[in-house]
């Protein structure tokens, strides 16, 4: 009987350990470690926060996933996902046909317009004709770079690429470029900063191009990782339904970022 009890207890312990391990599935969430307020920003202690961090963690909690933020440069996010350095990308990455050749995406979790900001002392709009002769800064390997090359290269003086959007913003403020294209919310945050207020203003939203800009931002997952994709999709629906999505969003925005406008990176 004693031997039987020991065996039973041992078996139960193994089963419990397996259950706990299963319930604490760790998922590495890839993001580019650059300031992209209000989506991602770093405090004085080095901790990352922002709307997208909060939404990512809410999705993970709803899906019962133990998520860990894993920094990788923007250019390395898709390669890192494919080589299993990370398990998903939640970094304002737009769902596009070109990216879907390499990775899969969850349903969208936000969608805002693409805009052009420029120097205050220059009057122009966000059209090819308006940007004629201008130097336009964009972040490399983003939908903004692809869009600018497709729609503005024939009229602009130069499409200048940067590793981060912040670098493009800094050059715009310094007068080294005439304009930059990015997500409207991110540009709005820059224009509300002391530096942005002093130098620049919004020139308008670019014309829609669903092929390049995509239908919105989703979580990137590896091709064939249907299980994680379905968990994330269910979690997005869950936090939209239970009010958590709106609760987080109201801390950062006074409008709906889930909307139907075209855009992000």
Locate predicted features.
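Extracytoplasmic small-molecule ligand-binding "clamshell" domains
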Residues: 25-93, 101, 242, 251, ...
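Bilobed "Venus flytrap"/periplasmic-binding protein-like clamshell domains
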Residues: 29, 33-36, 48-61, 115-165, ...
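Periplasmic-binding protein-like
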Residues: 33-34, 111-118, 195-233, 255-265
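Extended ligand-binding regions for polar small-molecule ligands
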Residues: 53-62, 122, 130, 135, ...
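Acidic, polar ligand-binding/catalytic clefts
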Residues: 57, 66-130, 206-212
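Alpha-to-beta junction loops
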Residues: 64-66, 82-91, 134-135, 173-186, ...
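Ligand-binding clefts/hinges and TM-proximal coupling segments of bilobed small-molecule sensing domains
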Residues: 66, 143-160, 201-203, 233-265
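A ligand-binding cleft/hinge motif common to bilobed small-molecule-binding domains
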Residues: 76-79, 93-101, 149-150, 178-213
